[in-house]
């Protein structure tokens, strides 16, 4: 590939509004009983299609609001989270959407905020303040963003008791003058240029084998700072036949089936469990139950059966 081809490819990736799709973490692709159509149902622009047991994202229709990433139970849809995490840190827990007036760190749409991002920011600053524009007429996310954001906050509180305040309009603070506005715009442009390449998602082949998705790493980091957590986990009851179904449908490889001597043993990596319920729905004898793990179990691998 020539230099110009590489430059064009990098530009196209940088301007593509779609989240990255990892089919190996998609419940539809995994053939989980009941499947999954949450991303299809939440997309305000009809940019999501479910075709051939996988998710297809329309580059033209997608606005990059991020709502699909928040509802995906297997973290199969994701944006690079490092830049948003840094913006929350620079803003000391304050962030605005791109349509909110005033100054401060910004993200394209508050729909891109995940439970992990909110919980991790809360573990640093205690309170997170978010400013939104007029979602009802916004062409990026639309009127469902506030409700969806509230659900993300509730999920985030499983990992850290974060307090979140959402305001419409400017972030609390002094109004910005003309000179300060120009400096803020200039600084924003410089940051955008500097962060453009680092913000690109890694190709699937570049991910480290066995590494948790970024969203789960943020949740785990927040949980390590919390007094107590309600991390999702599963329990296997009597009647398990040690078949491989639960391991096959698990989107994050949280469940392992290991041969030990003449028998198989099931293990759960708690930090990798999202509580998606794929194993619960797909278990042939229906002996798997969803529970909550305390803080001390989050970093453990537990024997299930």
Regions found by a protein language model. Give the residues of each.
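Basic (Lys/Arg-enriched) interaction patch that binds polyanionic ligands
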Residues: 55, 60-71, 175-179, 183-184
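Flanking helices and flexible, charged tails adjoining ferredoxin-like Fe-S electron-transfer domains
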Residues: 1-18, 23-24, 28, 67-174, ...
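Catalytic cofactor-binding cores of redox enzymes
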Residues: 164, 176, 180, 219
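Extended, charge-rich helix/loop segments that form flexible
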Residues: 185, 191, 195-213
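Ferredoxin-like iron-sulfur electron-transfer modules
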Residues: 8-35, 46-64, 82-85, 171, ...
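N-terminal secretory signal peptides and thylakoid transit peptides that target proteins
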Residues: 170-196
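A glycine- and small/hydrophobic-rich beta-loop-beta segment
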Residues: 213-219
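A structural signal for short beta-strand/turn segments enriched in small hydrophobics and glycine
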Residues: 36-39, 43, 68, 72, ...
């Amino acid at each position: 590939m020539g230099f110009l081809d590489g430059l064009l490819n990098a530009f196209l990736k940088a301007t593509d509004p779609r989240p990255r799709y990892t089919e190996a973490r998609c419940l539809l692709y995994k053939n989980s009983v009941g499947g999954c159509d949450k991303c299809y149902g939440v997309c305000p622009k009809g940019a999501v299609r479910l075709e051939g047991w996988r998710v297809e994202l329309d580059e033209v229709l997608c606005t990059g609001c991020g709502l699909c990433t928040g509802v995906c139970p297997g973290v199969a849809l994701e944006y690079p989270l490092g830049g948003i995490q840094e913006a929350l840190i620079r803003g000391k827990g304050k962030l605005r959407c791109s349509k909110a007036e005033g100054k401060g760190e910004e993200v394209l749409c508050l729909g891109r905020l995940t439970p992990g991002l909110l919980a991790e920011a809360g573990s640093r600053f205690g309170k997170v303040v978010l400013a939104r524009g007029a979602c009802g007429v916004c062409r990026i996310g639309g009127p469902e963003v506030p409700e969806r954001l509230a659900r993300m906050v509730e999920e985030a509180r499983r990992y850290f008791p974060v307090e979140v305040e959402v305001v419409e309009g400017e972030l609390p603070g002094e109004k910005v003058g003309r000179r300060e506005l120009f400096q803020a715009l200039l600084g924003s442009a410089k940051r955008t240029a500097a962060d453009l390449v680092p913000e690109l998602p890694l190709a699937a082949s570049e991910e480290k084998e066995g590494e948790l998705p970024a969203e789960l790493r943020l949740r785990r980091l927040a949980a390590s700072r919390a007094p107590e957590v309600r991390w999702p986990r599963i329990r296997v009851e009597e009647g398990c036949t040690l078949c491989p179904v639960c391991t096959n449908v698990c989107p994050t490889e949280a469940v392992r089936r290991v041969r030990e001597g003449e028998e198989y043993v099931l293990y759960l990596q708690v930090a990798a469990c999202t509580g998606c319920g794929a194993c619960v729905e797909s278990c042939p004898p229906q002996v798997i139950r969803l529970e909550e793990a305390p803080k001390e179990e989050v970093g453990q691998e537990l024997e299930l059966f």
